[in-house]
Amino acid sequence: MIILGLVLVSLLASTASAIQAWMPQVITGHEGRPLSVRCHYAGKNPSKPMTMMLLKTIEGSAFRGTIVPRFKGPVYTKSSCSSGTGVFTVDSLHMADAGRYACMVSQENDPKDESVCSDYHTAYTNIVVLETRRRRSLLGPQLTPTAGPRSTQLSQTTGPLSSQESEFSVVAVRKGVKVYVGSSLHVECQFSGATAGLNISAVLFKKVGEGAYQAVSTISTSSLTTLDLSPVIEGTGQAKWCGVNATKEDSGEYMCMIGMDFPEGEEGSGDEDFSGVDFFKITVVTEPGEDADEDDYLYTSSEEEKK
């Protein structure tokens, strides 16, 4: 049984208080051919400049990564005053380009605005490079696509967060989130298969018992007090919950629920389900130090479970 305390938020009326970014989980390209890497953003303050960088992450390092000069950009498309897409391009993809990449967006905020959880956000993707047919025939048919040390046997798609998908789906960006007491805390769930112009609703639940979940908005001790919903861009978007002062009470199991609402009487407003859920875990530790949140981004879900 799910204890509902729903607070439905319309994308058309929401106002983001913190910058955020999202990307497909996997981007596939072919050796020797051009590739475009798209990084969507929302929550931009129109009165302040925004910076976007594409970095290749460093294996085993908490440092975010290094710039790859061959990737040019970003060129901004589909831009409004607060959201849009930055596109990075490379003319000829190399096998060495395979790996995990970070898109970091940052914007200076007013330090007096305590509602802003962060002035930067990092989204991640895995670039898979497929060998050309000629090279594959020379090296043998046993070779598999290269995705870098963090990914193996990835499919030739852009993952569950692709604008090519027509079915509405939801996925938590991180299955395990670990931060220190007193640090900022943010969690994200992405959705795909959405129709632009329709209302999107998002609710975050915390597990309070066996099979029972309660809306975080009704839990007075929760630090996740701010919800930022992005607009739909190329069929995808993101819900970001955040807070500025994590406590031990924030630890636990969570479920995010995102739905797409059709106006009454329109196609899609019947019994078909246009909502999705995913689950993740938050751990708040007492060890002092810098915010652990961004460092956790550098691990895959399976690696996080081992920590």
UniProtKB/Swiss-Prot annotation:
Comp. bias (Polar residues): 143-160
Gene3D superfamilies per the UniProt record, alphabetical: Immunoglobulins
Residues in the signal sequence: 1-18
UniProt keyword Lyase present: no
Region (Disordered): 139-160
This protein's UniProt keywords: Signal
SUPFAM superfamilies assigned to the protein according to its UniProt record, in alphabetical order: Immunoglobulin
Protein name: Uncharacterized gene E2 protein
